[in-house]
Amino acid sequence: MAAKMFYDRDVSLSPIENKLIAIIGYGSQAHAHAQNLRDTGLNVVVGLREGSASRAKAEQAGLRVASIEDATREADVVMLLIPDENQPKVYEESVAPHLTEGKALAFGHGFNVHFGRIKPPAGVDVFLVAPKGPGHMLRRVYADGAGMPGIFAVAQDASGQARDIALAYARGIGCTRAGVLETTFKEETETDLFGEQSVLCGGVTSLIQAGFETLVEAGYQPEIAYFETLHEVKLIVDLIYEKGFEGMRHSISNTAEFGDYVTGPRMVTEQTKAEMKNVLSDIQTGKFAERFIQDAESGFPFMNEQRGKMRDHQLETVGKELRDMMPFISKKELEV
């Protein structure tokens, strides 16, 4: 059975038209949510901690800014869009005391609710809306009159209207222009983490790095290795993004396509897939979440060590030099 997509024609804004929506945070996703909701004609306040460097940015965008406590106290819908590791503390100290019965608590990712790090009270609605793309792109496509696909889920329906509120919110940020799918907090959290770790971030970067190192160790110029293993990834991914595997293979040379079929299975073997299942198991059991939380609470020693190693890697130093020679690469669009 095909999943049902919800579009503008299926969704009414009425469940949130006369409500105040508090966006907690003003980072990559939060700035896009706040501005899109505002431009849809909805009432928005941005909640920021005292002294936040983001206050000026939000005010320059024409948004009203308040403390997290005041924003939560005033709002009917509270969307928590700060980093996962910071959410529980901010929630307990600044949100929970003002999250009275009848309000709605929302998330862009189900991590903290699914793993029990945030436990909302019984009298509030709890939902998530997750656009499937970065914040700067969510804002850009909205401003262009289009939308970004997304997903939504309801974890707690205290009012009997949580699903309608979630869908209305998705419409408010422009996602129903492209279509949204219904999911659960469990499914969103586990599949999102798995995709990031095994394919999108961990898988892709490890594959690129191994390919680059293989060529350089064999005596090839690092600059050539960079082009062949990293730079051209975007060209192929864009084709897959627009046309799928078949369309991509139709667009490349016969030599490249033949090599795809012959060598792909040597790179991603049954052993690789078995390890992917282990990765998924670590996510499902909460093992990954526990490791992430421990590192975060210790000041990220492991993650900072890995960042330092990669910062000094030849792939990064050569890449920076080459990218500086490419005026067609826009640095501004990647800023948050």
From Swiss-Prot:
Residues bound to Mg(2+) 2: D192, E228, E232
Co-factor requirement: Mg(2+)
Active site (UniProt): H109
Binding site for Mg(2+) 1: D192, E196
Gene Ontology, cellular component aspect: cytosol
Example of a GO MF term: ketol-acid reductoisomerase activity
Annotated positions binding NADP(+): Y26, G27, S28, Q29, R49, S52, S54, D84, E85, N86, Q87, G135
Enzyme nomenclature, EC number: 1.1.1.86
PROSITE patterns registered for this protein in UniProt: KARI_C, KARI_N
Magnesium as UniProt keyword: yes
Keywords linked to the UniProt accession: Amino-acid biosynthesis, Branched-chain amino acid biosynthesis, Magnesium, Metal-binding, NADP, Oxidoreductase
Reaction catalysed by this enzyme: (2R)-2,3-dihydroxy-3-methylbutanoate + NADP(+) = (2S)-2-acetolactate + NADPH + H(+); (2R,3R)-2,3-dihydroxy-3-methylpentanoate + NADP(+) = (S)-2-ethyl-2-hydroxy-3-oxobutanoate + NADPH + H(+)
UniProt-listed InterPro entries: 6-PGluconate_DH-like_C_sf (IPR008927), KARI (IPR013023), KARI_C (IPR000506), KARI_N (IPR013116), KARI_prok (IPR014359), NAD(P)-bd_dom_sf (IPR036291)
Domain annotation KARI C-terminal knotted: ranges: 184-329
Gene Ontology biological process terms, A to Z: isoleucine biosynthetic process; L-valine biosynthetic process
Statement: the UniProt record of this protein carries the keyword Transcription regulation: no
Manner of cofactor binding, per the entry note: Binds 2 magnesium ions per subunit.
Residues where substrate binds: S253
Pathway assigned in UniProt: Amino-acid biosynthesis; L-isoleucine biosynthesis; L-isoleucine from 2-oxobutanoate: step 2/4; Amino-acid biosynthesis; L-valine biosynthesis; L-valine from pyruvate: step 2/4
Domain KARI N-terminal Rossmann: 3-183
Family that this chain belongs to: Belongs to the ketol-acid reductoisomerase family.
NCBIfam families: ilvC (TIGR00465), PRK05479.1 (NF004017), PRK13403.1 (NF009940)
Functional note: Involved in the biosynthesis of branched-chain amino acids (BCAA). Catalyzes an alkyl-migration followed by a ketol-acid reduction of (S)-2-acetolactate (S2AL) to yield (R)-2,3-dihydroxy-isovalerate. In the isomerase reaction, S2AL is rearranged via a Mg-dependent methyl migration to produce 3-hydroxy-3-methyl-2-ketobutyrate (HMKB). In the reductase reaction, this 2-ketoacid undergoes a metal-dependent reduction by NADPH to yield (R)-2,3-dihydroxy-isovalerate.
Protein name (database record): Ketol-acid reductoisomerase (NADP(+))
